[in-house]
Curated annotation (Swiss-Prot):
Protein's name according to its UniProt entry: Exodeoxyribonuclease 7 large subunit
Single GO BP term: DNA catabolic process
Gene behind this protein: xseA
Subunit structure as annotated in this protein's UniProt entry: Heterooligomer composed of large and small subunits.
Provenance organism: Limosilactobacillus reuteri (strain DSM 20016)
GO molecular function, one term: nucleic acid binding
The protein's role, per its UniProt record: Bidirectionally degrades single-stranded DNA into large acid-insoluble oligonucleotides, which are then degraded further into small acid-soluble oligonucleotides.
The protein's Enzyme Commission number: 3.1.11.6
GO terms for cellular component: cytoplasm; exodeoxyribonuclease VII complex
Family under the similarity heading: Belongs to the XseA family.
Localization (cell): Cytoplasm
């Protein structure tokens, strides 16, 4: 047999994985199916996609799963995008998912309704609304540094109530990182503690553009704010989760500034910050240039798909973590059984236990001895009684009482007639006495 013709399982698996990874049709796969075996995990998600005739294993790593706006559920029909590869450890092919959205109903709309239902059940929309101060000294604004929102708010405040100070907390208002940044700036303004009113807002846009203001982290930051919050997000027809939680909603940034300030005052101070605006324009130009340079660097392959370098390792770490937890649990059970077994043996070998056993044995022997002694005494009494009866039945006196006598001559018992002679004196013994007689005649048989 030529063994060189045979492959090992590992070699065959590596070859098949290479075929999967090099197939351009499997690099980007668009797939629709029903979620099966889905159970929400803390980090990476492992589940299956199925239709009426087939099933495929699926993996979605933590950094990709966090980008999903809705909450996947068992049995939900979804559309996914990912790449297909072979997991060498199990020898099974699976799809590594990069994006997921519901099949049919839009993912953002579904996520909006899910969060709205959740927060409504918690009563977050029905909390007591804080009063907006009529004469604010300081107004915090959480919005983009280079959008029209801050310009409109500044213009309106200078026109209506120029003695109020507007403090900008610049934030990203669009993209994956925007929600966390908005919430962080709301918390920063609250930590400062000397603001009368807080305005959050951005201009109009699509539902995707306005989505950061529909995130739970922003809603909870607004609800927890000690400063009264005015929300101005999108156009008048747009309604976000932030609008529902805020103390007051404004249709536009200008309307938000009007709600935050009293009736119009002198417009004379509107030009006081021209120099500051020119400086800000210069800074914006520099920031935009640097942002363009950064985007060019981020377009490289290593930044586009860095996660593929460690996907298999991340899955293996999850499996090993699960095995370690199971092994620790088994070891604890084994140790507990050993402790219980040794405890039983120690109890059995205890001197106190043996003394108790011996005491019980002594008590049993005492009882047996008393029982045997009484039985022996009764038996001996019966034997003595029987012997007495036997002796009594054999006693000469007993016989003599029935009319018998015995004869003596010279104090010797006469047993035979041949021992006597005529004229010999003898004594006849009765049970109640004796008499003396003389032999008159001897007759032998």
């Amino acid at each position: 047999m030529d063994r060189s013709q045979y492959l090992t399982v590992s070699e065959l698996t590596k070859y098949l994985k290479m075929k999967f990874d090099r197939d351009p049709y499997l690099h980007t796969v668009y797939l629709t199916g029903e979620l099966s075996n889905f159970r929400l995990r803390q980090k990476h998600q492992y589940f299956s996609l199925k239709d009426d005739n087939a099933v495929i294993d699926a993996v979605m790593f933590e950094h990709q799963f966090r980008k999903i706006k809705f909450t996947p559920e068992q049995g939900m029909k979804v559309c996914v995008v990912g790449h297909v590869s072979l997991y060498e450890k199990s020898g099974r092919y699976q799809i590594y998912i990069d994006r997921m959205e519901p099949d049919g109903l839009g993912s953002l709309y579904l996520a909006f309704e899910q969060l709205k239902k959740k927060l409504s059940a918690e009563g977050l929309f029905n909390l007591p609304k804080k009063q907006i101060p009529m004469f604010p000294k300081r107004i915090a604004v959480v919005t983009s540094i280079d959008g029209a929102v801050i310009r409109d708010i500044n213009t309106t405040v200078r026109r209506r109530y120029p003695i109020a100070q507007v403090v900008l907390y610049p934030t990203v208002v669009q993209g994956d990182k925007a929600a966390a940044d908005i919430a962080r700036q709301i918390n920063r303004a609250n930590d400062r503690g000397d603001f009368d009113t807080l305005i959050i807002g951005r201009g109009g846009g699509s539902m995707e553009d306005l989505w950061p203001f529909n995130e739970e982290v922003v809603a909870r930051a607004i609800a927890n704010s000690k400063i009264p919050v005015i929300s101005s997000v999108g156009h008048e027809t747009d309604t976000t989760i932030a609008d529902l939680v805020a103390d007051q909603r404004a249709a536009t940034p200008t309307a938000a500034a009007e709600l935050a300030t009293p009736v119009k005052l002198n417009d004379a101070l509107m030009t006081l910050k021209d120099d500051q605006n020119r400086l800000l324009n210069t800074m914006r130009t520099k920031i935009n240039f640097d942002r363009q340079q950064l985007n060019k660097q981020l377009q490289s392959y290593i930044f586009q798909q860095p996660t593929r370098l460690y996907e298999n390792y991340a899955q293996k770490v999850d499996q090993l973590t699960q095995q370690l937890g199971q092994a620790a649990q088994n070891k604890m059970q084994e140790l507990q059984m050993n402790v219980e077994r040794l405890s039983g043996r120690l109890t059995a070998a205890s001197p106190l236990h043996r003394v108790q056993q011996q005491e019980q044995l002594v008590d049993q022997l005492k009882k047996q001895l008393v029982t045997a002694s009484l039985a022996s005494q009764n038996e001996k009494k019966q034997q003595v009684t029987t012997l007495i009866k036997q002796l009594d039945s054999l006693s000469p006196l007993k016989i003599m009482s029935r009319g018998y006598t015995y004869v003596t001559s010279d104090e010797k018992v006469v047993n035979h007639a041949s021992q006597l002679t005529v004229g010999q004196n003898v004594h006849l013994h009765f049970d109640d006495g004796e008499v003396q007689a003389e032999i008159k005649k001897v007759k032998e048989h």
